[in-house]
Amino acid sequence: QMCIRDRGNLMGVVAAISAGGAGAVFWMWLIALLGASTAFIEATLAQIYKEKDPLYGGYRGGPAYYLHVLFASRSKRQRYSLFACLFALSGLLCWCGISQVISNSVASSFENAFHIPPLYTTIFLVAIAAIIVLRKNATVKVLDIMVPIMAACYFFLTIFIIVKNAGQLPDVLSRIFSEAFGLRQAVGGGIGAAIMNGAKRGLFSNEAGSGSAPCAAAAADIDHPAKEGLFQALGVFIDTYVICTCTAMIMLLVPQELTEGLAGMDLLQAAMAYYFGEFGVVFIALILFLFSFSTFLGILFYARSNVAYLFGDNWLSQTLYKVLALVMLFIGGIAAYQFVWDLGDVGVGLMTIFNMIALFPLAPKALQALTDYEHSHKR
């Protein structure tokens, strides 16, 4: 969570500005303020209610598990809880959508950079992803080296752009706030679009409240539940106010007439081309290609605990959901841009609703854990 090895730091911000204009950035910032506390609560609860994973070792958990405790605790023989099942199913829908967003973005960026038809890029992407699934350890070692290097390069390039164009920052900030609250935008419905897209893409990027991050938080080997919650809350701030803001700035510092009418990765690559020429277009394509694999691994990990909740601890279900993810990856590469985002949005929205059903009644448990953590550090 606390890194830029994630699809949302690029794709989410680009989609927000494409659909909601500069004003969407303000609403992403606001959502992050609310999301930090939500991230703390859900990650802490994931640690409190985690359980042993007999199939892979370690621990597993997430909203499906604390929803089960909340609604099925009176009947210990009850195998399922309705809301837990609904969350797990909506999570699978969401991660199918995210798989499609990944391949769609990579295919689009490769078409811009190398003029390769989306179908060919998609086939290659799915083939590499299949190797990751089958020979995970060897591939992950390569990703662990390459992805941080590319992420650091991207971060320093964005900082370089921002520093070089520091004189334009007041105008960009003015544009962000004016498009978030301006009279012209209010009359034309632009504020509504900015709020909606800023909120949706902010949630897509930092994941706070959607219930996906707790699936990873539950597996963390940490000495106190509240400690993991605090790490997740900090991650939301770093994700949104540092990484996502950098991505937003490099797009908004470009003259508007050069990016007018562009959407998706076309917009980001046009911005990078403005600063670095053809190198910028190719660099974004390559960094997206690498990020797609780390994100895909994250999707498989998130989905694993939910599949186990729905279908039990068996290798058949654990294999089938990976095959489904590969199929979704292929469909996304050749599907329409708006379709893949709509599918992901529906899944994220449903996950958030079911997750919030648990967070409100269980929040006192997380706050008790925080109090205990504070007392333990005072002693």
Regions inferred by a protein language model and the residue ranges of each:
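Transmembrane helix-loop junctions in multi-pass membrane proteins
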Residues: 8-13, 22, 94-107, 129-142, ...
